[in-house]
């Protein structure tokens, strides 16, 4: 089989360490359908296929990788989708739900997590390798400079675990930064107790000017609130917990200009 060349435009850095691939595959709980995003050379795929407690599917956009994977895992070929995960109709393809795993392409890792969020009722769990700084940011707590939009949104519906750090030398080509593996598991939250679409808007607005007090970015998006002032308006977005953002969303719904 011809070797697959990593393509910079696709954000590809192929994992070469079998022990790490085995750890990633083992970090996912058993049962149900599993979708691997970006199968690459099949380093992780081989250990997922060894698991008899899951049904593995794959998503890959690189034609060279797809040809390689078809040759290496012919029985897996019918479940390997030639297409972009970000465009996949998960609700149609996996109406019973699907877990998501992968060595996520670094250039779209944040978009992958937003896709998971949009399908949170379908995705009970995800294990992904991303840039270390992204993993830290997602798992961060309020009060940290790394705490941001995805931190709040993911933590609203998922418990996030930083599992382990992965060094540069176990990839081909080696990335310029360290990587990390994180695990997302749906928490007990089924409804936030506020307008969830508005919650997302409030969080994004609050962090749009993260170094300023909340009143500035929120008034820019939702108007002057009829002159009303929330007691948290003097705080910054990075200091609010998920529960506080939920409460703030309820307040904005009552006092703001919501379109």
Label every model-predicted segment.
Residues 205-259:
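C-terminal lobe and adjacent flexible extensions of AdoMet/dcAdoMet transferase-like proteins
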Residues 1-205, 243-259:
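Catalytic cores of RNA-modifying enzymes
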């Amino acid at each position: 089989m011809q070797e697959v060349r990593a393509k910079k435009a696709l954000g590809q850095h192929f994992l070469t360490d079998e022990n790490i691939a085995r750890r990633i595959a083992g970090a996912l709980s058993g049962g149900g359908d599993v979708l691997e995003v970006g199968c690459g050379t099949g380093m992780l795929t081989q250990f997922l296929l060894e698991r008899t407690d899951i049904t593995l599917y794959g998503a890959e956009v690189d034609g060279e990788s797809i040809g390689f994977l078809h040759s290496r895992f012919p029985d897996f070929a019918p479940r390997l989708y030639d297409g972009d995960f970000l465009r996949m109709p998960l609700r149609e393809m996996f109406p019973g739900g699907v877990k998501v795993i992968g060595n996520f392409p670094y250039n779209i890792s944040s978009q992958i997590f937003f896709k998971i969020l949009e399908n949170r009722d379908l995705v009970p769990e995800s294990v992904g390798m991303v840039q270390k700084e992204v993993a830290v940011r997602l798992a961060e707590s309020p009060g940290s400079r790394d705490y941001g939009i995805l931190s709040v949104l993911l933590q609203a519906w998922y418990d996030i675990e930083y599992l382990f750090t992965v060094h540069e030398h176990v990839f081909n080509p080696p990335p310029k930064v360290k990587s990390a593996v994180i695990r997302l598991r749906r928490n007990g939250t089924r409804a936030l107790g506020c307008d969830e679409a508005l919650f997302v808007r409030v969080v994004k607005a609050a962090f749009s000017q993260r170094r300023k007090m909340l009143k500035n970015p929120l008034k820019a998006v939702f108007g002057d609130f009829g002159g009303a002032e929330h007691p948290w308006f003097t705080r910054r977005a990075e200091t609010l917990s998920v529960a506080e953002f939920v409460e703030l969303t309820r307040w904005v719904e009552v006092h703001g200009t919501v379109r």
